[in-house]
Amino acid sequence: MRENALELHGVCKKYGGFALRNVGFTLPRGTVMGLIGENGAGKTTTIKAVLDLIRPDSGEITVLGEHGSNPSVREKIGVVLENGGFPSAMNAVQVDTLLGRAYRNWDTAQFFRYIERFGIDKEKAIKDYSKGMKTKLNIAAALSHDAELLLLDEPTSGLDPVVRDEVLDLLYDFMQDENHAILLSSHITSDLDKIADEITFIHKGEVLLSEPRDELLDTCGILRCTADQLDALDPSAVRAKRVGTFGCEALVRRDGVPENWPVEPVNIEQIMLFLTRGEDAR
């Protein structure tokens, strides 16, 4: 059995009117987990809790077998936060100097290989970068200190498709080492279709599902039916539903639906929309 790179058990944190409620999931080494949910669902808060940037009110978080505040563990985590980054007056040369002091395993040669690959002018101030260039710089930094776990908060948000594919290629290369793992928060579900092994869905601070992606897509589907047909199903077969004037549609478990009923394939985006906007049928 593979070791877990990340474990969360019963994590709770209250922020005024928002709260993480009993958040729990495990991320094995050798795995890319997509963390999905609408804006404000708790994705960034969860990542900050893993990084020990905020302290949960209760619960337990284990990172690479230890507590996330352990300095030796922090050395092994590569981080890209959506609204994070380096001072805008700095350039890539200064970023290299800064991070060379911060990380024992900082690899200057590796960092500048990424800078060259990305076509970044190492003397240019970050304030003059495009959004895509800033993201590439942050990812280059995350990949240049021998990290084992990447925590990425919306790393492809706002990027054009070509740059997004380039970023995903880098993550794919990182995962060639089966000791590595990635937690990737994103609302761009097409990216997760390409790279994610597992999907964790968080809604209003609560994890509604955490399952292997292929298993989720293979076992679930969309059923369009009448209200009477929906009522005839075992409730355990219906994960979420929408009831309208002219009929119903439901996110269902295929093995709980009669074989002669047409169940359409489903993708990650549709699952997220059903669980966010549909009526919970648990």
Where are these regions (language model features)?
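ABC transporter nucleotide-binding domains
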Residues: E3-L183, T189-S190, K194-H203
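Exposed alpha-helical structural elements
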Residues: Q110-R113, Q229-A232, N267, I271
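ABC transporter nucleotide-binding domain
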Residues: L168-V252
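C-terminal coupling/interaction segments
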Residues: V238-R282
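Non-catalytic surface loops within mature trypsin-like serine protease
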Residues: R29, A227, R254-G256
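Residues that form generic nucleotide/phosphate-binding pockets
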Residues: Y114-R117, L170, T219, I271-L275
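Short loop/turn segments at beta->alpha junctions
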Residues: N91, P212, E264-N267
